[in-house]
Amino acid sequence: METQPAPLPTRISVVMPCYNAAPYVREAVECVMGQTRGGVELIVVDDGSTDASRDILHALAAAHAPRMQVLHQDRKGPYPARNLGLRHAGGSLIAFLDADDYLSPDCLEKLAAALDETDADIAYCGWQNVGEGAPGTTPYVPPDYATLDTAAEFLRACPWPIHAALVRRAAIDAVGGFSERCFSAMDYDLWLRLYAHTQKIVRVPEVMAFYRWHGGGQISKTRWKQVLDALRVRRDFVAAHPERIAHLPAARLAELTDGYLLREAYRAYWRRELDDAQVLLRAALREGAWGVRDLKYILPALLPAPLFRRLVGLAGGQA
């Protein structure tokens, strides 16, 4: 009887929260189990799924034992789920993958090689949006942040999606894993806190992560909340790490933080996403993120919602 080679010791742990992802979770699991680099384990945290996800996960875990384990928690959200998975992770390198997304077969191998070849703590790659309602499906490779003003770039926008990076476990432990203080934007929060801890990042300029969209309602249902959470994350970073932003002129810093809120308010307004626009315009007034010229848009937003919508309609968007 032919002897099977012993599995490689675990070096990379992939943490995957799962909530009602039955149509997609098998593909997500298999993309991890099929990685070209050995020594990869998968920890899936079922976040109180009510569809067939749990049964699918247990069948897959049995097929891929001992490299895959399934944990369960009551519905708490993806960030508590990821923290639970981290507590059970055995690898010195950590990747995150949502249950409806996927990676190229060589993704973890190439990201790990980039970390091995440098002293970086984070390796990141390009990604592509796929599926119905995706806002553009052109593959995207982000810039080499190590050659830019990294603080400004990270404040401008979240630098990469949750599954487009591989991180040393020691760095994640040093910043305490994911914060659970906000409804959203806690992946962005993690990248900012990791940047404050270590500026050692390396880019792999290939598209190896794929983000699945599920139609136009994916973001818009809670867009205003995501914007306010992202603003809070930016402000918290600035307050906690003044040494990282001391080189930025005050006007530039304000444009990157408070200016983000007003930009998103106008974006929602001109897209006629008026529920979001009204909340964000009111928030801009409350937070002081406005100028005199903005008042012609902000003041109507203080009206009751039906009157605000009617006024915008009568003005053809020109409040």
Residue ranges and their predicted role:
Residues 106-138:
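Conserved donor NDP-sugar-binding/catalytic core segment of glycosyltransferases
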Residues 73-89:
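Glycine-rich, basic loop-to-helix element that forms the pyrophosphate-binding segment
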Residues 94:
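Short aromatic/hydrophobic "clamp" motif used to bind/position activated sugar donors
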Residues 12-24, 28, 35-36, 45:
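A conserved hydrophobic helix/loop-capping motif in glycosyltransferases and polysaccharide synthases
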Residues 144-228:
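Conserved nucleotide-sugar donor-binding catalytic segment
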Residues 31, 46-55, 98:
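A conserved acidic beta->alpha catalytic loop
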Residues 39-48, 69-74, 99:
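Short beta-strand/loop segment that forms part of the nucleotide-sugar
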Residues 207-215, 220-247, 270-287:
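Catalytic core of nucleotide-sugar-dependent glycosyltransferases
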